[in-house]
Amino acid sequence: MSIGSLAIVLHAHLPFVRHPEYPDFLEEDWLYEAISETYLPLLLVFDRLAEEQVPFRVTMTLTPTLVTMLRDELLMDRYGHRLDLLCELGAREVHRTRNDPVFSRLAHFYREHFESLRGAFRERYKRDLVSAFRRLQDAGHLEIITCNATHGFLPLMQQTPEAVRAQISVAANHYRLTFGRDAPGIWLAECGYYPGVEKFLAAERIRYFFVDTHGVTDATPRPLHGPFAPIYTEAGVAAYARDPESSQQVWSSQHGYPGDPTYREFYRDIGWDLELDYIRPFIQPTGDRKNTGFKYYRITGKTQDKQPYDPEAARQQAAVHAGNFLFNREKQFEWLSGKMGGRTPVVVAPYDAELYGHWWFEGPWFLEALIRKVAFDQKTFRLVTASDDLVEHPENQVATPPLSSWGAGGYANMWLDGSNDWVYRHLHHCARQMVALTKDFPDASTLHRRALNQAARELLLAQSSDWAFIMKTGTMVDYAVRRTKEHLLRFQRLHDEIRGGNIDEGWLAHIEGKNNIFPEIDYRVYRPG
């Protein structure tokens, strides 16, 4: 009989990036890389485990923005073309390296890898990854949860409760339409919680959410079991805390598994290493270089001297690390089991899904090895979801978590500082305007309704926490600033045209086609009160 429960949570999210006005757009690569490196590999792992009847339970967030992009015909057409290019590059690399015994093996590995992904995308999954994830949920292997509609950071939106409610309500409705049931839980974007938000979750029949460790350990009154059991908020929604130990083993840049010298080096790619004339057809149309996914070196060490990558050695190391993770969880549960007053401890191990495959190429191999080892090599603990835990332990302590996030510093530092604070006065102003529009136009006519619905979309897209995060980290700042301003300006124009009664239907149709997220939205989700 097991004495512990491990809840693995994979948070899959990307901001809504769709540019039909350009034939090729660099930031769309975020999606294409994530499909090739994370979503397809994870699906193949989960399907293989299911077909071999290996028991497993994993929680996975599929955010509304990500689901929308994965179901968009234009983006899936473009991704299919990207796979064709990668397969062509694989064939060229096999020819280029034919006389090099080391790199020839790697070229063959990548050619077979991308051809396998292309076959899975087109033949196995029929270009519909969301339905593939849904089948795994319907079969009882995954528990898919939702997230704020556009990943808005709720603690910085609480000045307008209607805006918070809209982020949650739109997401919950989107989930019902996509998966045919209520969302059992929610990943609050960035684990961003503030006291009171749970009432909006309860209204949508959402039963649980996740917070960082201090979101539970610093709750009032102090929880008896620390981060190893959920607490109920006053609204009856359960809060689960991240376990710091299991997170550190994977996330830590200094001590985590992904830094092992055997693993693939993320920052060496032939898109940067090879002659420009050779690689030009596979990089940006401007001739600017970018990653291709063909990475021939392993981490090796902290210097620039890198040794060739060995996929088989890396796969074996992933299995070793899976065994180490298993051993550490067994010892953790053995230590906890006598300290919980009869309550089964639950260790919550949440990660960005993109860590598994994108940042850590071997991550899907690690996860598959871990799931197999949990199923067959031990009896100390089992894999669960939060829903499973609540069924087994329906009575839990009632407490109020503090405002918290899982970002650096644990609060709102990443999304509110000198690099991005300028956005909030505009976001708050537009949110108040949206509430007022809903009050003043409670039953709008067809054209006005379209404009009001699009105004709601533009506001939601402007609220994405990704833009403030990018401004803070300094990666693609110009794009993040541009997107924020574009959505705010579109909202303001729509607001003014609605108020003035002179809606430009041609322009409205244009932006409806460009930002086509949430076609089912009803602007009255912003109704006052």
Residue ranges and their predicted role:
Residues 21-23, 45, 57, 111-113, ...:
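A short alpha-helix capping/helix-coil boundary motif
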Residues 2-57, 62-105, 224-529:
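Active-site and substrate-binding clefts of carbohydrate-active enzymes
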Residues 125-135, 154, 159-162, 166-169, ...:
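Gly/Pro-rich turn-and-neighbor structural signature
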